[in-house]
Amino acid sequence: MITITQTKSVEDIAKIQIIMQKYFKPHEIVSNNEFIYYIENYNKLYEGEDYFVYKIEDKNEIIGMLSGVKLNEFIVVDYFIVDAAHRCSSKYIMNTMINILKSYKLPIVIEAETESLCRLYQMFGFKKFSNPYKYIMLDVSMEENTSKILEYDSNLLFLSPCNLDFETTKQTIYKKHYMRWYSIYNDKLTKEYKKKLCV
């Protein structure tokens, strides 16, 4: 039986990282220590807001994860991944994931790099902003004294019904989600990102 439960366990995060390494690009993968630090300290650094992680298990084996940020304005889904061998249960997993996100009583937004992902989310009630959206991030897999800005076309979706304004939502994601993440690495990365956003 598949279960989805919240976790901050160091052991769980290590198992989740193994799945991430199978499917994510190197610049999208963070170290265990950095991930755990962020999970444990986010709500202390930003009062009233939180970073959450849910492990997806089948018979006590971790097969995926859902993570995101509860901001004051809305929920941002950060990572959502399920091991390929268990995607036959994707309908149940998606419905359970959405119910978990709805429990926060806030609007929900999610990024989708591909049209196939967009179609998947749209099957479960998400709608795509018609405005063009850029995925802007820094390559944190590089050496500490260097950084590289990665920018490519993506899509931003919201769970309907929702009255979020696109431009405000986009800027909030850039400045309150990504910029905060880079701040745990070093000042250079944060300055690079601020420069890109012109803030």
At which residue positions do the language-model features occur?
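Short amphipathic alpha-helix that is part of the acyltransferase structural core
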Residues: M1-E40, N155-L156, P161-I184, K188
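Hydrophobic beta-strand segments of well-ordered beta-sheets in folded domains
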Residues: M1-I2, L106-I110
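A conserved beta-strand-loop-helix scaffold within acyl/acetyltransferase catalytic domains
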Residues: I13-D83
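Short, high-confidence coil segments that cap the C-terminus of an alpha-helix
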Residues: Y51, S103-L106
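Residue-level recognition of the GNAT/N-acetyltransferase active site
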Residues: V82-A85, E113
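Conserved acetyl-CoA-binding loop-helix of GNAT-fold acetyltransferases
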Residues: A85-L101
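Terminal substrate-recognition subdomain of acyl/acetyltransferases
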Residues: V109-V199
